[in-house]
């Protein structure tokens, strides 16, 4: 009798845990969701790296220009998932960013499919793409840092900060960041 109760209790806990994780994943915007379903905030990512910096890697998939001029986590290696092509979109007049055809091969050059990799971009969208590309290539422990380096934009017309990226993200979380460049961490095409 006690054994049946224990089995039911364990099953109930597992089902509840799965339901909570599923709900958390679906509350994310589609653009930040990944096939692996592994998500961290910038704060959680820094803690995870800090606890096990020998085994946890932080990968910044923004363009080299963003990495250099906006700042970056001091331990983050830059391998862009998308690169600028020097054109502007007709509709919104924004830079056109094309998929970096060497992204997966460059990651494979330095990391194994079994490594724990925490991926950040500006605000979580490109990092989701990077996670999915790496998952397709056989990587299994790749996390999307859902608020990225700069964080999400404030959406409050009454706020002075409306449209500004001051809400969350690595830079706003209190985690270390820098403009200092380390050649071994910079993108080398």
Regions found by a protein language model. Give the residues of each.
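Bacterial N-terminal signal peptides that target proteins for export
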Residues: 1-10
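Short, surface-exposed ligand- or partner-binding patches at beta-edge/loop junctions that are enriched
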Residues: 120
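Bacterial N-terminal signal peptides
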Residues: 9-20
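Short hydrophobic beta-strand that contains or immediately precedes a catalytic carboxylate
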Residues: 57-62, 79
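Rhodanese-like catalytic fold shared by cysteine-dependent sulfurtransferases
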Residues: 2, 20-54, 68-116, 127-189
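Conserved G/P- and acidic residue-centered "switch" motifs that form tight phosphate/ATP-binding loops
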Residues: 124
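Short, flexible active-site loop motifs that bind/organize anionic cofactors or intermediates
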Residues: 14, 35, 57
